[in-house]
């Protein structure tokens, strides 16, 4: 289970979804749970997504 605190700690620099997945849960091949968490965090304004580079950042 991926937690918000772990995601925020992994976002020490802007990262793409797949590289975040490799840092947080490399054994899980599906990015669905992480993507769902990132979207909820984006709604809460904790993270931002740069559409041009495809990377997630801390807000």
Short names for language-model regions:
Residues 21-31:
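Short helix-coil junctions and helix-kink-helix linkers
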Residues 35-39:
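Short, hydrophobic-biased segments on the C-terminal half of alpha helices
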Residues 1, 49-59:
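Short, cationic-aromatic polyanion-contact patches
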Residues 1-8, 31:
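Short, leucine-enriched amphipathic alpha-helices that occur as contiguous helical runs
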Residues 45:
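Glycine-centered, phosphate/nucleic-acid-interacting loop/turn motifs that mediate DNA/RNA or nucleotide
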Residues 10-19:
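Short capping segments at the starts of secondary-structure elements
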């Amino acid at each position: 289970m991926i937690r918000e605190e772990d995601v925020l700690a992994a976002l020490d620099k802007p990262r793409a979804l797949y590289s975040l997945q490799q840092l947080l849960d490399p054994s899980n091949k599906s990015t669905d749970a992480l993507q769902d968490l990132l979207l909820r965090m984006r709604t809460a304004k904790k993270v931002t997504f740069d559409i041009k580079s495809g990377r997630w950042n801390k807000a």
